[in-house]
């Protein structure tokens, strides 16, 4: 079940490969995510010192979060991946010109997971072509439906 989607990622990038990563979260963050108070729109993923981090993800704390700790809604959160996956990501992002983008946050066996995509940026003409293709697919569906009735 999806918690939050990053629809902008599919508009701005060609997604080549997907990885599922665990997140290192604090208690108030888990409660806020379960309440649906998370936004992936401005978020991105970086590799620093052999570890993968989610940066710019906004998790709004619940009003009941804490009285003595001031939660930081946009702190960097560590992602949990296998060493082989991290090495693969490092190789692709450094050599092949790929970037890492968060695609969606979901539950897997009761745990909160983040799906990240190995992506290549789209140029403006690619975005236009994709939009034209989507419109044509919609028009085709409309024609097929009208022909069946």
From Swiss-Prot:
Start-end of Basic and acidic residues biased regions: 127-142
GO cellular component, as recorded: cytosol
Any one Gene Ontology molecular-function term assigned to this protein's record: RNA binding
Any Pfam family hit: SmpB
Region (Disordered): 121-149
The entry's keywords: Cytoplasm, RNA-binding
Chief subcellular location: cytoplasm
Compartments where located: Cytoplasm
GO biological process: trans-translation
Record family assignment: Belongs to the SmpB family.
UniProt xrefs under NCBIfam families: PRK05422.1 (NF003843), smpB (TIGR00086)
Protein function: Required for rescue of stalled ribosomes mediated by trans-translation. Binds to transfer-messenger RNA (tmRNA), required for stable association of tmRNA with ribosomes. tmRNA and SmpB together mimic tRNA shape, replacing the anticodon stem-loop with SmpB. tmRNA is encoded by the ssrA gene; the 2 termini fold to resemble tRNA(Ala) and it encodes a 'tag peptide', a short internal open reading frame. During trans-translation Ala-aminoacylated tmRNA acts like a tRNA, entering the A-site of stalled ribosomes, displacing the stalled mRNA.
Protein name: SsrA-binding protein
Organism this protein belongs to: Thiobacillus denitrificans (strain ATCC 25259 / T1)
Lineage, highest ranks first: Bacteria, Pseudomonadati, Pseudomonadota, Betaproteobacteria, Nitrosomonadales
């Amino acid at each position: 079940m999806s918690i939050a989607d990053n629809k902008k990622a599919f508009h701005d990038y060609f997604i080549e490969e997907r990885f599922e990563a665990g997140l290192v979260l604090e208690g108030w963050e888990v409660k806020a995510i379960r309440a649906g108070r998370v936004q992936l729109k401005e978020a991105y993923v970086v590799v620093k010192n052999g570890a993968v981090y989610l940066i710019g993800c906004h998790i709004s704390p619940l009003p009941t979060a804490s009285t003595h700790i001031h939660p930081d809604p946009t702190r960097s959160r560590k992602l949990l991946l296998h060493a082989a996956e991290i090495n693969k990501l490092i190789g692709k992002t450094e050599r092949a010109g790929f970037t890492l983008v968060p695609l969606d946050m979901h539950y897997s066996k009761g745990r909160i997971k983040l799906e990240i995509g190995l992506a290549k940026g789209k140029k403006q003409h690619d975005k236009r072509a994709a939009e034209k293709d989507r419109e044509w697919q919609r028009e085709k569906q409309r024609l097929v439906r009208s022909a069946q009735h």
